[in-house]
């Protein structure tokens, strides 16, 4: 039988590849490109989303991490982030 062998580095990168976050605010130009987002906004304020771990600009305010990400960095909207498991 055939198969794919992945290096430890590849496995590690896949493991840390996605994280969840809550949408705190949407900027005025978010999802404004009708060609890329013909159905309108993909997510809304208060949604839990899945994004790549390297997405956006990371910063801390009073010890809490925040990120500024582009609208096209949202991979999915998830109901409950506690149910998300990394493979």
Describe the residue ranges of each PLM region.
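Compact, glycine-rich, soluble single-domain proteins
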Residues: 1-87
């Amino acid at each position: 039988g055939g198969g794919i062998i992945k290096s430890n580095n590849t496995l590690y990168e896949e493991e840390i590849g996605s994280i969840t976050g809550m949408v705190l605010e949407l900027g005025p130009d978010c999802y404004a490109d009708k060609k890329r987002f013909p159905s309108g906004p993909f997510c809304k304020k208060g949604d839990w989303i899945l994004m790549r771990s390297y997405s956006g600009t990371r910063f801390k305010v009073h010890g809490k991490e925040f990120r500024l990400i582009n609208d096209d960095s949202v991979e999915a909207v998830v109901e409950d982030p506690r149910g998300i498991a990394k493979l």
